[in-house]
Regions:
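C-terminal and late-domain segments of enzyme folds
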Residues: 191-194
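Cofactor-/ligand-binding subdomain signature composed of acidic, glycine-rich
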Residues: 1-31
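Glycine-rich phosphate-binding loops that contact phosphosugars or nucleotide phosphates
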Residues: 23-187
Length: 194
């Protein structure tokens, strides 16, 4: 569970992929990007959304992490399914809530978009998970992979936080470079101050 200690350098190697995804999101004209997840898979993106807000030209990032029918209905009423990107996030791929969210919103999107519904969905999951298989079967636009050695609550600097960050228009490379400064400032080579 200590994979987060080195994640910044690993994710910086993928900065161009996140930038390309961000450009694609912008070009699609999505008005909303909705993270469907629970716990650590949704907490990091929620903090990013609350901290940075909506960026011009990019979708508003929203989080659905409650199965309460009123919250699901309220979220659905606030979006245009034809202009929404869904980010289904589950490390294990077997967490009940994200799977229920995926099934519900995919069915709703198919009613509006038909066979193009998968183009409005991306998955963030660990390699080999049930979510990976479901995303492939449902023709999701893209699957991003997390790191099995990182627990959900430490995953904001992995794909679980960076995919939503890119979708909302944040410069992921800059975010990671700033995180690297802090990582290096707290590293084992830094002498303690007395």
């Amino acid at each position: 569970w200590l994979g987060w200690l080195h994640i910044v350098e690993e994710e910086l190697e993928k900065a161009a992929d996140y930038a390309a995804f961000s450009d694609w999101v912008r070009a699609q004209g999505f008005t909303d990007a909705v993270v469907l997840g629970m716990g650590g898979s949704s907490l990091g993106p929620e903090v990013l959304s609350l901290t940075y807000g909506q960026r011009e030209g990019f979708p508003k990032l929203q989080i659905l992490d409650s199965t309460h029918p009123d919250q699901v209905r309220a979220l659905e009423a606030s979006i245009d399914l034809g202009k929404t990107l869904f980010i289904v996030a589950s490390k294990s791929g077997s967490t009940l809530e994200p799977n229920v969210f995926r099934d519900y919103f995919l069915a709703r999107a198919k009613a509006v978009l038909g066979d193009r519904a998968g183009d409005h969905f991306v998955a963030v999951t660990d390699p080999g998970s049930d979510m990976e298989r479901a995303a492939q079967a449902d023709n999701f636009k893209k699957i991003f992979y997390g790191v099995k050695q990182i627990g959900g609550r430490y995953s904001v600097l992995s794909a679980f936080g960076l995919v939503p960050a890119a979708a909302m228009g944040l410069d992921v490379k800059d975010l990671l470079e700033r995180a690297r400064i802090m990582v290096r400032s707290c590293g084992p080579a830094v002498p303690p101050h007395v």
